[in-house]
Structure formats: structure tokens, C-alpha cells
Amino acid sequence: LIQLVLYFFLFILLLFGLIGSLYYQTSSGTIRQQTERTTRNSIDQSSQFITSYLKKLKQTTTVLSKDQAVRQFAQDRSADQETVQHLMRTMIETDPDLVSAVLVTKDGRLVATDTKISMQTSSDMMNESWYQEAIKERAMPVLTPARKESLTSEKEKWVVSITQEVVDQTGQNLGVVRLDIGYDSLQAYLDHLQLGKQGF
């Protein structure tokens, strides 16, 4: 009788162990699938946001590069920069993610919304990669890698830029416009999505 009770007790233990193991495997698989699904959704959301955000910025840059006042200033050395600067300042004020705007003309004139950038020489800017890439892409908007920019409001700030060549009616180069976006704006949104915090 004691052996029978012992066998029965062992059988119950094995049964509980088997059920527990199956439950653990099932639960673990479900949790893993849920986590992977959440991570994929976060990646998709991030990708869609960045794509639509950059599309909007590229459209803004295109509008600026084709603006009549910008073209006229770039063509005419005697033209007043006030109209162009007012236009660029308005763009900066209406989009909190934009930190500065710059126009460098082919003949070496510089208009910028930030006074610290205004103190730089246009010849130095013409030698920088963002200027050269804009020329190379023939009036198409170009996204530049993140870099540090010295601004009046901050000692240094990480920015991502959209640049575009300014051309006349015949497609001849007149200069390059650049819009600087605070990198922390993109980073803050991606952090808000909590990508990776629930992933593997």
C-alpha cells in the first residue's frame, strides 16, 4: 500500500512537472512572439515617421530653393538680402525642429539665420561636403549625415541637414540652400517609441 501511494505521488509530481513545462514553453513562445511583434511595429513606425518627416523637409527645401526672391538674390549682386533672410527666418519660426537656414551663392555671398554661421566665410562653406553634394545632385534635395554645428544659442549642436542647389531658369548653378534640423528632435521621437526596451 505504501509503495502504491509512493508511485501515485511520484506520478502526480511528474504530471505537474510535465504540465508546468508545457505551460512554460507555451507562455514563453507567446511572450516572445508578442515582443517581436511589438518590436517590428516600433521599427515600422520609426521608418514611416522618418520617411514622411524627411519628405516634408525636402519639400520645404525645394520651395526655398525655387523661391523667386532667393533666385533673384543669387543672380543679382546688388540685391538686398533682407527679403531672403526674412523668408528663411519665417521658415525657422514655423517649424520648431529647424535650427538654422543658410544660402551660399555661387559668387560667394552668404545669408544665414544664425549670426554665428553668418561669421563663417562662404569660400570655406563651398569646400564642405554638403555644398559639393548639393551641386553634384543637380537641384535635387540631399540629406547630409549628422554633424556638429556651432550656433549662437548653443556652443555646439548635432544637426542633420537638407541641402539643395539653387538654379536659374536654364538650370545653371546659382548657389546652395541648407536647412539644419536639430538631431535631438528625431532622437526624442524615436526614444518616445521605446524601440528596443521591450525587444530582444
Predicted regions and their residues:
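Extreme N-terminal signal-anchor transmembrane helix of membrane signaling/transducer proteins, especially
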Residues: 1-29, 33
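Structured catalytic/translocation cores of nucleotide/phosphate-coupled proteins
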Residues: 19-24, 31, 35-36, 105, ...
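Generic structural "secondary-structure junction" signal
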Residues: 6, 72-75, 168
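Glycine-centered, small-residue-biased loops immediately flanking beta-strands
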Residues: 199
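Extracytoplasmic/periplasmic ligand-binding sensor regions of membrane-associated signaling proteins
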Residues: 94-97, 106-192
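Extracytoplasmic/periplasmic sensory segments of membrane signal-transduction proteins
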Residues: 37-47, 52-140
